[in-house]
């Protein structure tokens, strides 16, 4: 499947930009008939001479304005009245000639700093863009779990100081780049692409069972107090399972209980003998149940047939 979600053919790479890392179609080799091939080795039907000629004729026949396709033919360029249109067909007010001339005059008249940024009034969007101002977007930040990645105070945070920005700019100018302007890998393995690292530190090697945990065990007919599981009585153990949507079948004295994290169903125990906490076999979702019981290789959602708690009295 191509990156555009099509199964039958891959798109030509004429439009690939530098960030996507694709090669331009004119730099790729074609076969004797002028076709390109997809990554899977199939012939790209859109790269043939007939398709390319047809596309060229269609492009020449489309009405244009200032070198761009006009909106009445599906383009987003300036129309005959020199404005752009929204997707719903209305005039975009910021693209009118008056608005563009006003923006141009404002941009030329406003003062800039040594980095080329606008020096706007304090509190304006131009002066504080990318920084955190007290009271701004508090609700949105709380929904995200706090002010993540945002400076608490731009006045004292060094990342917003001019010296820090100048140093970053100097380091960026000194780094080597390839033919497309991308940073070349450095000695420490940094490849210059934000969000991508050459090592795999994000993968945790110890797969912990985050699904269920037991909170103590009692040997006198207590209730299983899991996440909203009320009504499943187990003789000989107190299980507090936090597993999401798991089944604990026949745990401690053949009591069948279903416990889930939210809105779970828990059935009554059947044939529970008081005094004996028997073997629990095939307990799905490793919730630790019974006295001195252990579930090995337990994960939420996975089936692990583990024997737990073979204590007899």
UniProtKB/Swiss-Prot annotation:
One of its GO terms (cellular component) is virion component. The keyword Calcium does not apply. Residues 24-33, 40-85, 95-116, 156-181 have a biased composition (Basic and acidic residues). Residues 206-266, 272-313 have a biased composition (Low complexity). Residues 1-313 are annotated as: Disordered. Residues 194-205 have a biased composition (Basic residues). Keywords: Virion. The keyword Cytoplasm does not apply. It is found in: Virion. This is Uncharacterized protein R705. The lineage of its organism: Viruses, Varidnaviria, Bamfordvirae, Nucleocytoviricota, Megaviricetes.
């Amino acid at each position: 499947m191509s990156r555009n979600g099509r199964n039958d053919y891959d798109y030509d790479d004429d439009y690939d930009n530098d960030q996507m890392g694709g090669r331009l179609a004119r730099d790729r080799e074609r076969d004797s008939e002028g076709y390109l091939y997809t990554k899977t080795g199939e012939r790209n039907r859109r790269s043939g001479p007939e398709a390319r000629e047809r596309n060229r004729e269609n492009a020449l026949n489309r009405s244009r304005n200032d070198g761009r396709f006009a909106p009445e033919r599906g383009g987003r360029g300036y129309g005959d009245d020199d404005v752009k249109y929204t997707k719903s067909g209305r005039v975009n007010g910021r693209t009118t000639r008056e608005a563009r001339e006003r923006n141009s005059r404002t941009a030329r008249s406003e003062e800039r700093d040594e980095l080329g940024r606008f020096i706007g009034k304090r509190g304006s969007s131009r002066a504080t863009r990318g920084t955190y101002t007290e009271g701004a977007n508090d609700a949105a930040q709380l929904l995200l779990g706090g002010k993540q990645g945002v400076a608490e105070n731009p006045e004292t945070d060094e990342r917003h100081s001019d010296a820090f920005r100048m140093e970053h700019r100097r380091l960026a100018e000194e780094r080597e780049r390839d033919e497309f302007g991308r940073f070349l890998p450095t000695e420490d393995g940094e490849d210059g692409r934000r969000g991508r690292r050459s090592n795999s530190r994000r993968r945790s090697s110890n797969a912990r069972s985050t699904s269920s945990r037991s909170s103590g065990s009692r040997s006198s007919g207590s209730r299983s107090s899991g996440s909203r599981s009320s009504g499943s009585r187990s003789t000989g153990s107190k299980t507090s399972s936090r597993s999401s949507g798991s089944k604990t079948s026949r745990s401690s004295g053949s009591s069948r209980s279903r416990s889930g994290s939210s809105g779970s169903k828990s059935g009554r125990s059947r044939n529970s003998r008081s005094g004996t906490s028997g073997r629990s076999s095939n307990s799905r979702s490793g919730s630790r149940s019974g006295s001195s019981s252990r579930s090995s290789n337990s994960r939420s959602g996975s089936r692990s047939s583990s024997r737990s708690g073979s204590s007899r009295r």
